[in-house]
Curated annotation (Swiss-Prot):
Superkingdom of the source species: Bacteria
Keywords: Aminoacyl-tRNA synthetase, ATP-binding, Cytoplasm, Ligase, Nucleotide-binding, Protein biosynthesis
Protein name: Glycine--tRNA ligase beta subunit
Native source organism of the sequence: Bradyrhizobium sp. (strain BTAi1 / ATCC BAA-1182)
PROSITE patterns: AA_TRNA_LIGASE_II_GLYAB
HAMAP family: Gly_tRNA_synth_beta
Length: 701
């Protein structure tokens, strides 16, 4: 079947937009093909700085013919309805319609509409210009004299040419005939801007990709990345160094070049006195270059790797010299900033926070730092941290935000705080907390383990969460401007991965007490709402680890479950138990008991609380179940008190035979009202016994 080749050739597309633009082009074209009844075999999109390209293979040469029966008005119906039917179906008279006879509903007119399929080439010529005009660039522009006319094309950068061909692999393809803003689609594209700028005539994708390669254009972004990484590693290795890989920078650099040429430059070793992260940020942010390390020392080497977009006649000497000149100036600035920062102690910067507002309803940064310091000191004994060191770390943790280096490179906040703290003689734990209190900042980020860092990190995140909850600035839908979901996940990971035992409600209460803001929610409602938010985040966390979200609901339904470590352990034990036959059957029996109770409680408008009366037991199965509940309840309660949830589940399993026998032999809704009530109370005892670990009614299945 025929294939489509489409290329949109323009001025340089920003690197950050290329991947999404390629995917958007693929999606828009293939979605429209499917909507037109043209099911394709495969599609792949590509992007370079100067072009978006798409190949779709295995497209039918034409649409299938369609036959449709459209039911009309009743025979003898109103004239207006009949005329509307004729107009909608394109029939000239009722003689062209058939009559469908229905003994019950009567006779109706039916139009048989035959719609011949169109040639795919015509469909493409109609749909492609619409896709170009409606392309979803995040930012676009108009250009030239045509920009003054109504309906002028908007594109990310001036669009120069469109290549569009369609045909079989064994035949000469057809040009898809259309134009956009005076740009006619054709078979012509262009090579590298400097090394092969001449026009190139192409026929289909294989021919197109090969000719571009000859014209110094690597079409596939992944191939450009592979070239950059391979050549950079080899170049570094040849000099005795190792490439410091940077996937984000690699994505960007591969979008800046069509023909990657890797070169190495150098800088004065004197600049290595500046922290490595600052050197890397300087070279990366300003010149989009990679740094290299010396494997002998593990530190950075006074070299950098750049990616040019041309094979220079002088072997790249001029390009290297230009980059060295700029990097020298930037590193000189960074060194000056760093040395200037070292002249001022961190605590001497703190008064400036009095003039910086954290949030209009939550006060200044100075007030926030004071709250974090107080809360961290309260958390310290709960996590085994030294109280004095924790208070000192919390006080200094934000100070580097006012330094010159962090002002220039915000991505090194915290890290620079650590360096400055060490430089002024602070304890190692205090310095580490200055960096680590921001962590973890994402699912793949490292979780601090030093108790001082953990205490400050918890205080920082909980102050943020409680503060924004108090002023009713909670996340809604997809909106989370203050990254509160990330903060909650950070708290969860800090607690669970460090096996910490603490009452979340108690700590949140301390954070709320230190706020001194008027909240629209009372403390109890705020705490309950916040705990529910943590439950939702914990479900997300555990689901990613393969756990069931309903088990989290079942544990939180017990109420007062603010010890997240114990929640996780209950969920783990419950999950393992429910994988066994005993667990599955006990769940079924417990849910059956809960369902019967729900129906009867609704019917009688009352709860069946209280202990059953042993004198009203009529059957051995009732007595056996009552005995089993008593024994299991005691055994499970003892195990839960010891926080041995696996043992509690093992005890629960002993209920299974008695529950199964009860439902097999006992009629719950006995004709005798007293016996019925007693048996319903016995069912309630099953529910209460299993609640030692979780609310089984919340578990699916």
């Amino acid at each position: 079947m025929p294939d489509l080749l489409l290329e949109l050739f323009s001025e340089e597309i920003p690197a950050r937009m290329q991947a999404k633009a390629a995917e958007d082009l693929r999606r828009m074209v293939t979605d429209k093909l499917v909507a037109e009844g043209l099911v394709y075999e495969g599609a792949k999109a590509f992007a370079t700085p100067r072009r978006l390209a798409l190949t779709v293979h295995g497209i039918p040469a034409r649409q299938a013919d369609l036959k449709e029966e459209r039911k009309g008005p009743r025979v003898g119906g109103p004239d207006a309805a009949i005329q509307g039917f004729l107009k909608a179906t394109g029939l000239s008279s009722l003689e062209e319609a058939t009559i469908q006879r229905d003994p019950k509903k009567g006779d109706f007119y039916v139009a048989l509409i035959e719609k011949p399929g169109r040639a795919t080439l015509d469909v493409l010529a109609e749909m492609l210009p619409v896709i170009v005009r409606t392309f979803p660039w995040p930012k676009s522009m108009r250009w030239g004299k045509r920009s003054e006319k109504p309906g002028a094309l908007n594109w990310v950068r001036p669009l120069h040419a469109i290549t569009a061909t369609f045909g079989l692999e064994t035949e000469e393809p057809d040009v898809v005939s259309f134009s956009v803003d005076g740009i006619e689609a054709g078979q012509t594209t262009y090579g590298h801007r400097f090394m092969a700028p001449a026009a190139i005539s192409v026929r289909r994708f294989e021919d197109y990709e090969a000719k571009l390669l000859d014209a110094k254009v690597v079409l596939d972004p992944q191939r450009r990345k592979d070239t950059i990484v391979t050549d950079a590693k080899q170049l570094a290795f040849a000099q005795g160094y190792e490439l410091v890989e940077d996937p984000v920078l690699l994505d960007e650099v591969s979008g800046l070049v069509e023909w990657p040429v890797v070169l190495m430059g150098s800088f004065d070793p004197e600049y290595l006195k500046v922290p490595a992260e600052v050197i890397r940020a300087t070279i990366r942010n300003n010149q989009k270059c990679f740094v290299v390390r010396d494997p002998k020392t593990g530190g950075l080497a006074p070299k950098f790797i750049l990616t040019a977009n041309i094979e220079a006649t002088d072997g790249g000497k001029t390009i290297i010299a230009g980059n060295e000149r700029v990097i020298r100036a930037r590193l000189s600035d960074a060194k000056f900033f760093y040395e200037t920062d070292l002249k001022t102690r961190l605590e001497d910067r703190l008064p400036k926070f009095e003039q910086i507002v954290f949030h209009e309803k939550l006060g200044t940064q100075a007030a926030r730092i004071a709250r974090i310091e107080k809360l961290a000191a309260e958390i310290a004994p709960l996590v085994g941290a030294d109280a004095a060191k924790t208070a000192r770390a919390a006080k200094l943790a934000k100070a580097d935000l006012l330094t010159e280096v962090v002002g220039e490179f915000p991505e090194v906040q915290g890290l620079m705080g650590k360096y400055y703290a060490l430089a002024q003689g602070e304890d190692v734990s205090v310095a580490a907390a200055c960096e680590e209190h921001y962590k973890p900042q994402g699912p793949g980020d490292r979780v601090p383990t030093d108790p001082v860092s953990v205490a400050v990190a918890l205080a920082d995140k909980l102050d943020t969460l409680v503060g924004f909850w108090a002023i009713d600035e909670k996340p809604t839908g997809s909106k989370d401007p203050y990254a509160l979901r990330r903060a909650a996940l950070g708290v969860i990971r800090l607690i669970t991965e460090n096996s910490l035992r603490l009452s979340l409600l108690q700590v949140a209460g301390s954070a709320l007490a230190g706020l001194h803001v008027k909240s629209e929610l009372d403390a109890g409602k705020l705490s309950a709402d916040l705990l529910s938010f943590f439950a939702d985040r914990l479900k997300v966390q555990l689901r990613e680890q393969g756990a069931r979200h309903d088990l989290v609901d079942a544990v939180f339904a017990l109420g007062g479950q603010d010890d997240l470590l114990m929640v996780v352990r209950r969920v783990e034990a419950l999950g393992k138990f429910l994988e066994t036959d005993d667990g599955k059957n006990l769940l079924a029996g417990t849910k059956r008991a809960s369902n019967i109770l729900a129906i009867e409680e609704k019917k009688d408008k009352r709860k069946f609380d209280g202990a059953p009366d042993a004198a009203l037991y009529r059957l051995d199965e009732e007595k056996a179940l009552a005995k089993a509940i008593g024994e299991v309840g005691s055994e499970a309660g003892t195990a839960v008190a010891k926080e041995d949830f696996a043992a509690a589940m093992h005890a629960m399993a002993k209920l299974r035979p008695a529950v199964d026998a009860f439902f097999d032999k006992v009629k719950v809704n006995d004709d005798d009202a007293a016996i019925r009530e007693n048996r319903l109370k016995l069912l309630n005892e099953i529910r209460n016994a299993t609640r030692a670990v979780a609310d089984f009614s919340k578990i699916e299945g």
